[in-house]
């Protein structure tokens, strides 16, 4: 099974390189900058986990930004949601509302790639199907 990387204004290709470098199959990369279209839910149902992300994770994420919507749809579909963000300003309760499994901070391509690698290692031990 594959992983879905759905990022808003972050470099999804860099995250994908990190995931692949750690040994995961090539992920399905979805550009969420313009919101979620009709294909998103079908793509979500075809993966074992989703990585959402945006430049800043905060209370506005819960109140309507696309990363919050990705997390809600993932929870509704029974798909674990992880986040890679530029800055994490969301309190633990907010993360629980979104049911985020991991939250990693990264800025720039090199850090995004490294975050992808760290997340892949966690996924391979936590949620990777046999």
Labelled PLM ranges:
Residues 1-130:
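N-terminal loops that bind phosphate or other acidic moieties
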């Amino acid at each position: 099974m594959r992983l879905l990387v759905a990022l808003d204004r972050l470099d999804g290709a860099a995250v994908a390189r990190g995931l692949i470098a750690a040994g995961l199959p090539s992920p399905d990369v979805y550009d969420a900058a313009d919101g979620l279209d009709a294909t998103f839910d079908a793509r979500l149902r075809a993966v074992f986990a989703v990585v959402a992300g945006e430049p800043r994770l905060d209370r506005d994420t819960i109140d309507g930004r696309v990363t919050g919507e990705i997390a809600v749809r993932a929870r509704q579909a029974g798909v674990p949601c992880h986040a890679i963000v530029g800055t994490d300003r969301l309190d633990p309760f907010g993360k629980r509302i979104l049911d985020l499994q991991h939250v990693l901070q990264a800025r720039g391509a090199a850090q995004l790639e490294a975050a992808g690698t760290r997340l892949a290692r966690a996924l391979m031990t936590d949620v990777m199907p046999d």
